[in-house]
């Protein structure tokens, strides 16, 4: 359809393409940007760019796609793009975003983190504001209905007073840990006090170490983000404890809802007991995100979260934390 919003995809790795190369009909789940755009009723994927020649050869089987190994050349083939998606490695985001404004897209959707440092992020946001380019960062849990419901339950006090949020994660702080810093930021705001404990780096000497962060809020809530390294099996566990209930989430697959009940044997004591389980439909996150972008572009509906809010996480780890030395 010629009236669809035109999209360019920069980066066709796992989240860009590899995790879901399908072009199924509208309404199904999608685990890559390629699949989510292809299924959308509002968007048309016109061009893709990647430096991997094998991936490009695979994508060339789709006659409707313009495939390039240079994203600049791809963007230069049209006078105007409605949406440009950046799904490249984290450390490349700043350079790409700094140049994208020259091509004047209406909107840019970039994978988290926005950038590796707040100074670069501030510069990018200012440039986009000056050019009138909308910017959205993909913190995927914000586009999952199950997490939105969790936030509402917490804010409405249905689990009592928030006491503790503990998260274990593998991988780097910026690439994986930021998901959960953002979750705490979304649910509780920024902490009053925080400390960071540097962890292990990747064998390729990446600066993105698997750090541990401990935060305290004015309310007394404790947030513990615990990095368990790069070499362990993929593991993300979230546990929340409130005075009247809680929940646990393992690997973003399902929520175990808990409630506070009296202990049968020990009078006067209470425990958290599993109330029900709820599946998390992770495959709907990207379709939901693209619906939000379409509403923004077609109906001028503002994004619920602006890019400056995302930079609060970078500022937190750069300026707001006391960095403690590692112990041997």
Task: Tell what function each PLM region has.
Residues 203-204, 219-289, 303-306:
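NAD(P)-dinucleotide binding in Rossmann-like oxidoreductases
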């Amino acid at each position: 359809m010629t009236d669809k919003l035109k999209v360019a995809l920069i980066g066709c790795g796992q989240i860009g393409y590899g995790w879901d190369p399908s072009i199924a009909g509208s309404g199904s789940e999608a685990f890559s940007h390629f699949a989510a755009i292809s299924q959308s009723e509002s968007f048309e994927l016109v061009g893709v760019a990647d430096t991997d020649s094998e991936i490009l050869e695979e994508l060339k089987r789709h006659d409707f796609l313009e495939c390039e190994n240079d994203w600049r050349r791809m963007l230069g083939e049209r006078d105007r793009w409605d949406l440009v998606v950046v799904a490249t490695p984290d450390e490349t985001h700043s350079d790409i975003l700094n140049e994208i404004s020259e091509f004047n897209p209406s909107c840019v959707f970039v994978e988290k983190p926005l950038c590796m440092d707040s100074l670069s992020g501030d510069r990018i946001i200012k440039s986009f504001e000056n050019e009138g380019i909308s910017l959205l960062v993909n913190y995927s849990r914000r586009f999952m209905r199950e997490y939105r419901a969790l936030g509402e339950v917490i804010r409405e006090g249905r689990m009592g007073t928030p006491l503790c949020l503990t998260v274990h994660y593998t991988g780097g702080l910026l690439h994986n840990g930021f998901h959960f810093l953002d979750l705490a930021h979304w649910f509780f705001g920024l902490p009053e006090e925080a400390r960071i404990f540097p962890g292990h780096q990747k064998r390729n000497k990446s600066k993105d170490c698997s750090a541990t962060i401990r935060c305290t809020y004015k309310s007394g809530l404790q947030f513990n983000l615990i990095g368990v390294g790069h070499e362990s099996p993929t593991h993300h566990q979230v546990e929340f404890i409130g005075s009247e209930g809680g929940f646990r989430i393992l690997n973003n697959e399902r929520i175990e809802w808990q409630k506070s009940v009296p202990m049968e044997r020990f009078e006067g004591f209470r425990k958290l007991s599993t109330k029900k389980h709820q599946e998390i439909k992770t495959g709907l996150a990207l379709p939901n995100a693209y619906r939000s972008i379409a509403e923004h572009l077609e109906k001028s509906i503002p994004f619920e979260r602006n890019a400056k809010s995302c930079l609060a996480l970078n500022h937190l780890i750069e300026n707001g934390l006391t960095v403690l030395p590692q112990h041997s």
